[in-house]
Curated annotation (Swiss-Prot):
Extracellular topological segments: 1-5, 63-93, 149-185, 255-265
This protein's UniProt keywords: G-protein coupled receptor, Glycoprotein, Membrane, Receptor, Sensory transduction, Taste, Transducer, Transmembrane, Transmembrane helix
CDD domains: 7tm_TAS2R3 (cd15020)
Membrane-spanning segments: 6-26, 42-62, 94-114, 128-148, 186-206, 234-254, 266-286
Location within or outside the cell: Membrane
One Pfam family cited in the UniProt record for this chain: TAS2R
Disulfide linkage: none
GO MF term (any one): G protein-coupled receptor activity
Name of the gene this protein is made from: TAS2R3
Residues with glycosylation annotation: 165
Protein name, entry field: Taste receptor type 2 member 3
Amino acid sequence: MGLTEGLFLILSGTQFALGILVNCFIGLVNGSSWFKTKRMSLSDFIITTLAFLRIILLCIILTDSFLIEFSPNAHDSGVIMQIIDVSWTFTNHLSIWLATCLGVLYCLKIASFSHPTFLWLKWRVSRVMVWMLLGVLLLSCGSTASLINEFKLYSVFRGIEATXNVTEHFRKKRSEYYLIHVLGTLWYLPPLIVSLAAYFLLIFSLGRHTRQMLQNGTSSRDPSTEAHKRAIRIILSSFFLFLLYFLAFLIASFGNFLPKTKMAKMIGEVMTMFYPAGHSFILILGNSKLKQTFVEMLRCESGHLKPGSKGPIFS
């Protein structure tokens, strides 16, 4: 094992550990809160489910990383490869859609518009979000099922490539795989468009609200303005992290067709681990309960706050 492979394993292991810690923290805080009150808000439910899915996703990515390094032949074998691909695709698509649902929830709760359609959705936000969650679950199942043929084709041509028996039939199969793979990436467009729509609606709503505050001679740092800004920061950060994750996913998936296949795969795998951990950390900073618990925990560790005591968390 060379320097590059060792660095790859260290980075993968570090990001995996950080991602597991961050997402387990979310699950424990929200889980203990639910256990005490027997109630959980819709946003907490989405964030907790997202954390659970990301723990699974990180485990899948780490398994894939170790197989690439220590057992490339097993990694490219039909059954193992298809199991990893199906598991990765489902958890990946569902977690991306859940992050999108969270942005939509923030938009409906915080933004203010007088359009009848928006008001109808805002007044029925809980019912709308429940149906949306069911919809994205079915959509994730459908997108995964639609890509099963792609996974089978990949296993076929990797097997043929290993025998070095490159025929015209093989070239046709590989071209077919390219086409299906490119079309498969289009499944990422809908959540991206919905997230952008929620972001711009919040921007427009913030602009209108700020103008109203200025006209009334009121301070622009009112609770509604701060809520707008916090939601915009979360959605915008999520958007840029998602773009980075999408780029990493493309590098990892198209790595088989690049000159340095193994190197491209390793770079892609390391980059993909950043999103499940980074976005969850952003959610902690954007959620008052999670942020307060996180800051209290840090103060306890540094000896500035005794466990169970209340400190001035926010200025």
